[in-house]
């Protein structure tokens, strides 16, 4: 089951504020694989019908005219590997982001510089065995949208902490930096 409700308000300044709430409830069947435990290996068990996966999130968007703020925070329960590594169970999670942006449009060249902090503490359900994941990152970026059909973005990210969930034992990256580029075609 999935539901979302949001409502935009036009403020006296002409700027728009949109508030929303969304949530879902269902079951998720995570993939599992053997992990090394004490000289042997164990494949974590999970319910055949899947693990309870439910969340509620709150959203607020103050659309940039020229300054804007966007945030979303979610709370819930989802698949996560147990502390002893023998089963995938439903455990609490939380996370979200806060983004500040600015719309600058000079000579038909719209630029959107932004700063975004993102945080997550919970199971990573799409990774094998749904291990616990911590994410705490800060992004600095610039989006260029000269044409409505094409958006180009460059982002510098600083990772305060991010759990590496691809290989057991699940370690943590701290103090990492990366640069990303994205081209998005809108049709």
Residue ranges and their predicted role:
Residues 1-22:
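Internal alpha/beta core interface subdomains
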Residues 15-187:
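Outer-membrane beta-barrel pore domains
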């Amino acid at each position: 089951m999935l539901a979302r409700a949001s409502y935009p308000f036009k403020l006296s300044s002409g700027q728009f504020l949109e508030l929303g709430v969304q949530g879902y409830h269902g079951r998720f069947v995570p993939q599992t694989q053997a992990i090394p435990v004490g000289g042997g290996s164990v494949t974590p068990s999970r319910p055949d019908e899947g693990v309870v996966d439910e969340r509620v999130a709150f959203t607020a968007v103050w659309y940039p005219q020229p300054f804007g703020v966007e945030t979303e925070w979610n709370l819930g329960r989802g698949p996560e590997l147990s502390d002893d590594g023998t089963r995938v169970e439903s455990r609490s999670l939380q996370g979200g982001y806060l983004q500040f942006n600015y719309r600058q449009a000079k000579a038909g060249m719209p630029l959107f510089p932004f700063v975004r902090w993102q945080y997550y503490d919970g199971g990573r359900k799409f990774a094998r065995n749904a291990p616990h994941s911590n994410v705490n990152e800060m992004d600095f970026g610039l989006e260029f949208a000269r044409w409505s059909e094409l958006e180009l973005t460059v982002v510098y990210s600083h990772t305060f902490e991010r759990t590496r969930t691809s290989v057991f034992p699940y370690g943590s990256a701290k103090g990492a930096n990366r640069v990303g580029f994205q081209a998005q075609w809108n049709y």
